[in-house]
Amino acid sequence: MKRLSTKVILIATVLVFMSSCAPPQPTKIVPAEFKTGQDYYHKVCANCHGADALGKQTRAPGLIDPEYLSENFSDEEMYKQIIEGSDKMRPQRNKLSDPEVAEIIKYIRYSQKAADLVVGEDESDEDEDQ
């Protein structure tokens, strides 16, 4: 009996560990034209930037933020950041092709628009707090 309970605990521990290693799954349904980008995002980006790209309780910043809108951070800059990385982000050039990066950027831009972000949103929020 003791041996059986030890095996059950061991199996349960392994299953919990394995499920925690899986990339976060999409949390929202997106139009078909953005689904491919969402899939690539969840395979490569979501572990750090969060399943919903908000970055809450993750190692990396949220991308659904006015700082990363195209007016502040162009598609070319985002592409370069993804491919080349930075001191805070590993390069993803070995994980993604150019078309895959383009799909991810398209998905991020869609997600930003869906969140109704506008440039300067943070500043207006600060003014309201004062």
Indicate where each model-derived feature is located.
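Flexible coil segments in periplasmic/lumen-exposed cytochrome c-class electron-transfer proteins
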Residues: P24-T27, P31, H42, R90-Q130
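C-terminal motif of bacterial Sec signal peptides marking the signal peptidase cleavage site
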Residues: F17-S20
